[in-house]
Amino acid sequence: MVALILGAAIWDRVSDEPAKAVRWRDVTAEVPGLELPRPTGRAYGSRSKLADYFRAVMPGRAPAPPRIDFRRDEAVLVGSGPRSSTGYDLRVVRVEERGDTVDVRVRERTPSLGEPTEARITYPYRLIVFKRIDKPVHVIWEGR
């Protein structure tokens, strides 16, 4: 039964119309110092919801959300949670409209042995913005 359900889910993804690239922009630099205490990946359709999340994860010291025209755009915040050094980074690989969803594909870069890093807690994250598409957003972590 599980195999049947899994097979149907895979077939649904394979049989859909081809993926359509979604243009996006990275606004991470407009929110310096954000510290996300656990992995996250979610879409925000309003400034107030994004601000509420920032306040929830950084009480008393949350940065203000960047200027985003939420009448036209939506934002997606992805974060890997705390990491032990400066060598970690997140990269948005691509954003695609696929069937009835928008897929945001993310890859975490980890430092290799011998790479110069500083041992301190870091919080890799990306905040991206794209034109509002009235479909659910799925964050897909590649390589995990």
Which residues does each PLM region occupy?
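Exposed, flexible binding/inhibitory loops of compact, secreted disulfide-stabilized domains
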Residues: 3-144
